[in-house]
Amino acid sequence: MTTTGSLPAQPSSTSPRTGNPSTDRALAMLLALVREGVTDVVLCPGSRSQALALVAAELERVDGVRLHVRIDERAAGFLALGLGVESGRPAPVITTSGTAVANLHPAVLEGWHSGVPMLLLTGDRPAELRGIASNQTTRQPGMFGDRVVVVDVPAPEETDEDLSRDARLARDAYRRARDERTPVHVNVAFRDPLSVAVPDLAEAVAEAHAAADAEAAAAPAPAGPTAADVLDLPHGPRTLVVAGHAAGEAAEELARAGGWPLAAEISSGSHFGPNLVVSFRELLARPGFGDRVERVIVFGHPTLTREVPLLVGREDVEAIVVGSTGGEDYDPRHRVTAHPAAVRVVGEPADPAEARRWTGTWVQASRAILDEASAAESAPLLPSGTTPAERRDFARAELAAVRADVTRRHLVRALWQATWPHDRLVLGASRLIREADRALPGKRVRVHANRGLAGIDGTISTGLGIALASQAGSGSAAAGITRVLVGDLTLLHDVGSLLIGTGERVPRIQVIVGNDGGGTIFDGLEVANTAAPAAIDRVMFTPQRVDLASLAKAYGWTHLRAATHGELEAALTTASGAPLLIEVPLVR
């Protein structure tokens, strides 16, 4: 058994006792989590975990937590992932035993590789019922591999020592998940009888909330990196700053401080600022740009280009990777020369004019590429001093633009234009995130994506978690909307997440589906040049003809079809009481 520390337990003096070991364990653990500041719990129904479920229901009744119930554990795992991504705190996810636990694995893998805090509370049989082919029983501790922290808690006894231990384990597991930004698995054994009625928890919750508020007020500010962890960066080498997924704003701050060009992916958190180079892919391959880079400083996890790992792996380039965004360090070709926790710029450039030219050349070239691409899809502009005939021609051209079919580039631009800083944007793994990365200008908008393993699974549920977390607070994001942009296969892979049960919280959310009938991302990969078209269609493109309008109706979502520029603009600004699925037909 792996435990997470030996801090003294702080059981509540008013924590109720029922005399049932299973229920009292659930009370001790969940009230300890409320004292830690837990606000959201995700739960799937099941017999072995019923004590935890019933206590969670009582906590919801007395406003102790926001409870989110799902019938599919895979969807529940990604919902918890989304809550953790947005809030920075683990949202405990409760399941019963057996395959229920296994279905959390995709979300756990994404959480580990992305550095997202997660806390799994999984019900299990006691030791005497394991390994004897008991129903719905398998080896749950270690199911997620040796990289995920696991605590295997034996079946409870009715003693103060056991309850103190349970509270301590729950608290320590939560803190480790939160502070280390990693999944932690607490496997909890329960012995019959599995539950009794849960007492009123209003008083216990009031005390727990007061304790959480007091601890939050007394908590010291997060400690920054020590001087030994900070690498000084002198001016001199021609430098490019790269911001991969989840880099945060530190990459933009460094690029500005150093006066260096910034290649920031769309989900980096640094896709803004005066030094932003949107078209860095094209420029890395262009003579006079990529071939002149002498030093590259990487934040986050770059996943959307092949040019960046090639640059980092070059023998003539000094490669520095700052910090970590998940369980593994970014080090393509094992060429990274330094991996500091933080960096800072020191000194002044020897030739300030040359330093400005270096960055200005990148920024101006990128803008020229974007302007050229934008001109092809932009609506006409009415010049001043026009004649009546010219105005009629303009009106006809403008009407034609409104009626024009939506392309991938127009789709991502329209979505970007409709999204404000208090909104949230979630991009699924498809051609569309790459189109957004290539086409969208700088803007300080919070963009999320599951790029730890870059799978298509769980995108809708992740988006729902992000929406629920962002809209639950009192800040500006509470008034925002979450938009989730996916391809058709990404939607269908996670279609069960459209099920939001009766009585569940329904956030403001739009799921925008670029429907091109299958997996067109493979059309741009090497396989398109090596395999027969019929084989590609059969095993890679995987064509589909799902009626998305009927699908949306079955799950209680509003469906809109937006095939033209005008229809898309209207759909994105539609106010809907129900969650909204916007289908955008696209040509393969």
Curated annotation (Swiss-Prot):
Could you say which EC number(s) this protein's record lists? 2.2.1.9
Q: Please list the GO terms describing molecular function.
A: 2-succinyl-5-enolpyruvyl-6-hydroxy-3-cyclohexene-1-carboxylic-acid synthase activity; magnesium ion binding; manganese ion binding; thiamine pyrophosphate binding
Q: What class of enzyme is it?
A: transferase
The biological pathway it contributes to is: Quinol/quinone metabolism; 1,4-dihydroxy-2-naphthoate biosynthesis; 1,4-dihydroxy-2-naphthoate from chorismate: step 2/7; Quinol/quinone metabolism; menaquinone biosynthesis
Keywords from UniProt, A to Z, are: Magnesium, Manganese, Menaquinone biosynthesis, Metal-binding, Thiamine pyrophosphate, Transferase
Tell me how the cofactor is bound: Binds 1 thiamine pyrophosphate per subunit.
Q: Name one Pfam family in it.
A: TPP_enzyme_C
Swiss-Prot/TrEMBL catalytic activity: isochorismate + 2-oxoglutarate + H(+) = 5-enolpyruvoyl-6-hydroxy-2-succinyl-cyclohex-3-ene-1-carboxylate + CO2
The disulfide bonds in this chain are none
Region feature Disordered, mapped onto this chain: 1-22
Q: Name one GO biological process term.
A: menaquinone biosynthetic process
Named cofactor requirement(s): Mg(2+); Mn(2+); thiamine diphosphate
Q: What does this protein do?
A: Catalyzes the thiamine diphosphate-dependent decarboxylation of 2-oxoglutarate and the subsequent addition of the resulting succinic semialdehyde-thiamine pyrophosphate anion to isochorismate to yield 2-succinyl-5-enolpyruvyl-6-hydroxy-3-cyclohexene-1-carboxylate (SEPHCHC).
Q: What's the family?
A: Belongs to the TPP enzyme family. MenD subfamily.
Q: How does it assemble?
A: Homodimer.
Q: Which PANTHER family does the UniProt record give? A: 2-SUCCINYL-5-ENOLPYRUVYL-6-HYDROXY-3-CYCLOHEXENE-1-CARBOXYLATE SYNTHASE, PROTEIN PHYLLO, CHLOROPLASTIC
The name under which this protein is listed is: 2-succinyl-5-enolpyruvyl-6-hydroxy-3-cyclohexene-1-carboxylate synthase
- Origin species: Clavibacter michiganensis subsp. michiganensis (strain NCPPB 382)
